[in-house]
Amino acid sequence: MKEFSLDTSYLYGHACHTIDQVLSFFGRPDHIHYDVRQLLGTNRMNDYFDLDLYYGSTKVSVKSSYFRIKERPSFVVYGKKGMFVKATKDRQEEDLKKFYLPNHPDFGLDLPEHYGVLTYVDENGVYHEEKVVSEVGDYSRVYQALHDSIVLGKEKLIQDQETILQIEILEEGIRQMKEKIGRAHV
């Protein structure tokens, strides 16, 4: 990208998916810390973001960089006695990119090598590491619900305030990035 544009923004194009998931699981955060950068320089695309969404004592981080040699895990969850790591993304997108369509019974299904890994110490102090079978995703439910809302007048699956909150979060990230750049040039 030669110059910054919202419609090609790395934050808008990539963080939006994960922020959507976080908001659907946790709701409106109490507080958000934004770190959105243009590593290629001013007026170029924002190519790095690190957003920390706080929910009481829980912190959810959404981060990525255009400049990474390896992909980050999709999810890492830390607890007091263990952690869960899901390294790979939902298979639906990968299947669609290969024109492997939803009419196949195994569309979007993770193979064992894609499962998350739960590592923990139990109440007896014994270490465990086990694979966790992935939930089956289904993008088509969202599109069907959108159709049913528009055509049949059914209640929306995704409420307006959820979409507005996501846009507000993305816009605030861009605003803070631009504000930081403005202070650097004063």
State what each model feature region is.
Residues 25-27, 55, 150:
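A broad structural signal for alpha-helix termini and local helix breaks/kinks
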Residues 17-21, 116, 142-146:
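Hydrophobic alpha-helical segments typical of transmembrane helices
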Residues 2-7, 127, 131, 155:
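Short amphipathic alpha-helical segments at helix-loop
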Residues 130-185:
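C-terminal helix-rich "cap/oligomerization" subdomain common to oxidoreductases
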Residues 27-31, 58-59, 82, 155, ...:
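Generic structural signal for secondary-structure transition and capping sites
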Residues 1-35, 39-42, 180:
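Predominantly a Rossmann-like dinucleotide-binding segment in NAD(P)-dependent oxidoreductases
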Residues 39-46, 58-141, 159:
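NAD(P)-dinucleotide binding in Rossmann-like oxidoreductases
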